[in-house]
């Protein structure tokens, strides 16, 4: 309806990076350029495992009611908060947690007397925060979508998909990411067979793609300014 036939660039990080990879696989003739950040071409066993524990946390909450909680007037707050805590632990790096929290107690609490460690208070905060604003079933479905992500399924595999892509593909990984490790991005670049993996340097783990704005901006600028393969370069001063 909009008459858009080709996209100058498709850019995404994390789950958005999965969607970007799917655009490349599903519409290779329409996507001129793509930037996949802190993501992958297919889910790994480790990602599926992290997601599974989150789904179980939600669906095991008695207030989930097999997903029919709205009709029953209930809400699986505890399950959703726990799922977020599990997820948030995977979003940050072990080194950041150690440097930021160590084994320090939560202010005003004593872990030896039933109180919390500081890192536990941090996770509790983020769990409660998400539970106030997110739908549990939507969380489950998004997590399941990530687990089943595989752009090579039904298309001859990851290598076949990316080797056939004629556009420009940039793939970037966060060097401290334990949810979408560097190896997942490396696999994509090897399948594409051209260029090199870009590295985002950050102590913040997977969330580095949200925090390191200057590095992301540099990647976006590189992508949108890059001429397509086969496109003549304009050289200043040459007629």
PLM features: what roles do these ranges have?
Residues 1-9, 18, 28:
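Conserved acidic catalytic loop of the alpha/beta-hydrolase fold
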Residues 30-32, 36-129:
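Alpha/beta-hydrolase-fold enzymes
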Residues 125-126, 141-161:
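Active-site nucleophile elbow and catalytic-triad environment of alpha/beta-hydrolase enzymes
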Residues 154, 178-184:
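Conserved alpha/beta-hydrolase "acid-adjacent" motif
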Residues 165, 171-173, 177:
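Short beta-strand/loop motif that positions the catalytic acidic residue
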Residues 186-190, 194-239:
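Catalytic active-site module of serine/aspartate enzymes centered on a nucleophile-bearing elbow/loop
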